[in-house]
Each structure stands twice: as structure tokens, then as C-alpha cells.
Amino acid sequence: MAYAIIEASGKQLWVEPGRFYDLDRLDADLDQSLTLDKVLLVQDEGAPQIGQPYVAGATVQVTVLSHPRGRKVTVYKMKPKKKTRKKQGHRQDLTRVLVESITVGGKVLTANAADLPKSEADIDAAG
């Protein structure tokens, strides 16, 4: 099982080829292909390659699937014995990306054909 740990949107993510992930909103169009080069670790076969801080020559190729919004978070503040109440809601803008491949040292790591989703309906059903 090939995987990489990347830094994207200020967070570290464990990513595998053929799977999709929700990141904070990226400035990219739908079906646009992006290359993420902040790769902290790559594991394929044998010992993992650990970067200091990033693995040299390692990239992760992703495709933008959609720009959904996250679940609503409700923030409620009140002061007891006073008539002070404040209720706010927030929904985070997200970008759903599909990891196409991981490239390290000229070697391209992709998912098996059986692991890839067949259609957009399969992607929506999984997430």
C-alpha cells in the first residue's frame, strides 16, 4: 500500500492514490489538475522516505472534484443572570480532491484499477 503524508491547507494529511479528501478551499477550477509538492513522507515498499522537512523530488498529483461546504458549526455564547446571548453559525468552504498519483524519484505510484471509483455517483455514495 503506497501512501504519502502531505502538507496542504495548513494541515498534514495521510493520502493514498485513488482516494478523495476534503481540504480547505483551494483557488482552483473544477476538474483542474494540481501538483502538491509539500510531501513530508512517502511509503511504497521497504523503508519510508522521510523529508527534512520535505522529500526532495516528491509530488502528489490531485484533481479537483467539487467545492462543497462543510457541516454547520453552531457557536452559542451566553452570560448567566444577564440577558446577553449570541448565536452564530459557520460553514467552512472546502475543496474535494482526488489523488491521482504520487511521484517520488521518477517512480509514479498509482492506485489499482479496481480501487478507483467508476463514476461521480460512486464518489458521492462513498462520501
Curated annotation (Swiss-Prot):
Species name: Synechococcus elongatus (strain ATCC 33912 / PCC 7942 / FACHB-805) (Anacystis nidulans R2)
UniProt GO MF annotations: rRNA binding; structural constituent of ribosome
Protein name per Swiss-Prot or TrEMBL: Large ribosomal subunit protein bL21
Pfam families reported in the protein's UniProt record: Ribosomal_L21p
A GO CC annotation given for this chain: cytoplasm
Listed GO biological process terms: translation
Keyword Metal-binding tagged: no
Subunit structure: Part of the 50S ribosomal subunit. Contacts protein L20.
